[in-house]
Amino acid sequence: MCWGRSWTFGRSSSKGWRPTSSASSYDEHRADLSTLADEMVDLASQGRDGLEVDRAFHLKLMEPLGNDLILQLTEAFWQVQAIVAPTLRTEPEDRLITAQRHRAIVDAATAGDPEALRSAIADHYAPIRTSIARAVQS
């Protein structure tokens, strides 16, 4: 599968979000997602915060689903993230890892590898889980 055949995401209780083939709705988003992922890596490499770019990436990723509820839930997550993120001890390497994992999401989707996409999405959340664990232990 490639960007030409694109992705939508279904819900599976055992796998979380899972990619499934659909129309070519992501073709028009590939360049934007790639640019956002690159910008996140650049910001993280400079030790700068990329939360707004991260937010834009996730909203752009979900747009082709055509599901307003998913977009609203994604936006709600980012409102919570904006409140919680400053209270977490985020290490500079966490930011870079997160940014690189956004790039991995784009690369896996572009390559048409559903397993790599599932893995990239799951791996993407590891740094935030680590930050939350640090905050809870403090």
Curated annotation (Swiss-Prot):
Keyword Cell cycle: no
Start and end residues of each stretch annotated as Disordered: 1-25
GO MF entries: DNA binding
Gene3D superfamilies: GntR ligand-binding domain-like
Segments of skewed composition (Polar residues): 9-25
Keywords: DNA-binding, Transcription, Transcription regulation
UniProt xrefs under InterPro entries: GntR_C, TF_FadR/GntR_C
Function of the molecule: May serve as a transcriptional regulator.
Protein name as catalogued: Putative transcriptional regulatory protein NedR
